[in-house]
């Protein structure tokens, strides 16, 4: 940044979640430095905020080993080209947003050229492949972390890291409107309500849906008024779930929803879900939950040896204890899942205590992440 040249920030986002984060960061930076310039790899939201897209984000948004191998030459070309062009541009700061397999190497290339680098969103190095922390430390001047235990992990290895809070915690109210959500979904205010979220990936839906449906059948024996909501991320997952339901529980009445996962969580007395970001969202929705997860036996055996944390769900990792029940592999079966959910549907002491802890954890990670990220970028640009 000089008198002649405006503040110049280079960014690379590789998927929709990164595009959303990038747009929020650009917005917060423009409020402080209206004439700043933003360039890089951007999706529609970042471009709408004024980011010049040298490449479209879709170029990087490939999933799965086969797809990555098929596009490898193109991905390597893009990374080499960005290394050259950013090297010539000399931005004040480079921000790699998530997409660690692409961005961390790029960050390292740029840092060698004297460009300051930030990695925005920590990979799960605290959970597995922990040695990646050394590569991240060499490649970046700063990591921006969503969660406090991530910063504690980086501190242990003397890698500069700033905890900025979680954007999802900023977006969701501390006290959600349960009856308002029920009105949206057509659920009576006085009914018991259970949300089933068997995951967003095909393999998860295939592995979990039957047990989740059988669990709901057991719970309806205790609560005949039980309303069951099943938000599904897209038409493919809905079709898959409908097929499994027709085989396992054809007579069980459920509300299948296209999207509306957040509304389903807010409306429900309890949720049964696969692990992942959904567990964090459910915590922020203040919906008591049970986590059920299954994977192929060899994958689970491998995961047990690679994963270095005591828990799989983010609420438990944040709390540092088993706040929500995690039933994995053989434990993830209808009788045990139903037994864990029953006290939550009773809306008694157990669910109230869980709700209060969820609220405390929400406050801990509600720190205005966009503003914090913008502040970190500007401090590094000085």
Curated annotation (Swiss-Prot):
PANTHER family: LIPID-A-DISACCHARIDE SYNTHASE, LIPID-A-DISACCHARIDE SYNTHASE, MITOCHONDRIAL-RELATED. GO terms for molecular function: lipid-A-disaccharide synthase activity; phospholipid binding. Keywords: Glycosyltransferase, Lipid A biosynthesis, Lipid biosynthesis, Lipid metabolism, Transferase. It holds the Pfam family LpxB. The keyword Transmembrane helix does not apply. This is Lipid-A-disaccharide synthase. HAMAP family: LpxB. Pathway: Glycolipid biosynthesis; lipid IV(A) biosynthesis; lipid IV(A) from (3R)-3-hydroxytetradecanoyl-[acyl-carrier-protein] and UDP-N-acetyl-alpha-D-glucosamine: step 5/6. It catalyses: 2-N,3-O-bis[(3R)-3-hydroxytetradecanoyl]-alpha-D-glucosaminyl 1-phosphate + UDP-2-N,3-O-bis[(3R)-3-hydroxytetradecanoyl]-alpha-D-glucosamine = lipid A disaccharide (E. coli) + UDP + H(+); a lipid X + a UDP-2-N,3-O-bis[(3R)-3-hydroxyacyl]-alpha-D-glucosamine = a lipid A disaccharide + UDP + H(+). One of its GO terms (cellular component) is membrane. The lineage of its organism: Bacteria, Pseudomonadati, Pseudomonadota, Gammaproteobacteria, Enterobacterales. Condensation of UDP-2,3-diacylglucosamine and 2,3-diacylglucosamine-1-phosphate to form lipid A disaccharide, a precursor of lipid A, a phosphorylated glycolipid that anchors the lipopolysaccharide to the outer membrane of the cell. GO terms for biological process: lipid A biosynthetic process. Its EC number is 2.4.1.182. Belongs to the LpxB family. It is an enzyme of class 2 (transferase). The gene is lpxB.
């Amino acid at each position: 940044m000089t008198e002649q040249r405006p503040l110049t920030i280079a960014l690379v986002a590789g998927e929709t979640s990164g595009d959303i984060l990038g747009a929020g960061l650009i917005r917060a930076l423009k409020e402080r430095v209206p004439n700043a310039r933003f360039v890089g790899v951007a999706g529609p939201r970042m471009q709408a905020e004024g980011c010049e897209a040298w490449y479209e984000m879709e170029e990087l948004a490939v999933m799965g080993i086969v797809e990555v191998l098929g596009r490898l030459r193109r991905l390597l070309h893009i990374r080499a080209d960005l290394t050259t062009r950013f090297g010539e541009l000399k931005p004040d700061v480079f921000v790699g947003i998530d997409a660690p397999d692409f961005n961390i190497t790029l960050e390292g290339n740029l840092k060698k050229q004297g460009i300051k680098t930030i990695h925005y969103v920590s990979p799960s190095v605290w959970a597995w492949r922990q040695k990646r922390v050394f590569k991240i430390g060499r490649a970046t001047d700063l990591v921006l972390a969503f969660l406090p235990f991530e910063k504690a992990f980086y501190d242990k290895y003397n890698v500069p890291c700033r905890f900025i809070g979680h954007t999802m915690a900023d977006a969701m109210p501390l006290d959600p409107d349960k009856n308002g959500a029920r009105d949206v979904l057509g659920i009576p205010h006085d009914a018991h309500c259970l949300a089933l979220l068997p995951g967003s990936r095909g393999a998860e839906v295939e592995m979990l849906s039957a047990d989740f449906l059988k669990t709901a059948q057991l719970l309806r024996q205790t609560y005949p008024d039980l309303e069951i909501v099943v938000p599904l991320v897209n038409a493919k997952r809905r079709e898959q779930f409908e097929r499994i339901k027709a085989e396992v529980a054809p007579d069980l009445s459920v509300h299948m929803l296209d999207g509306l996962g957040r509304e389903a969580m807010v409306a429900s007395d309890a949720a049964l879900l696969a692990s992942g970001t959904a567990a964090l969202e459910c915590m922020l929705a203040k919906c008591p939950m049970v986590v059920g997860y299954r994977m192929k036996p060899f994958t689970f055996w491998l995961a047990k040896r690679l994963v270095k944390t005591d828990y799989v769900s983010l609420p438990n990792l944040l709390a540092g204890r088993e706040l929500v029940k995690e039933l994995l592999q053989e434990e993830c079966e209808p009788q045990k899942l139903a037994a864990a959910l029953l006290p939550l549907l009773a809306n008694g002491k157990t669910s109230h205590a869980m709700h209060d802890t969820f609220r405390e954890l929400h406050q801990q990670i509600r720190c205005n992440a966009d503003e914090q990220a913008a502040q970190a970028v500007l401090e590094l640009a000085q």
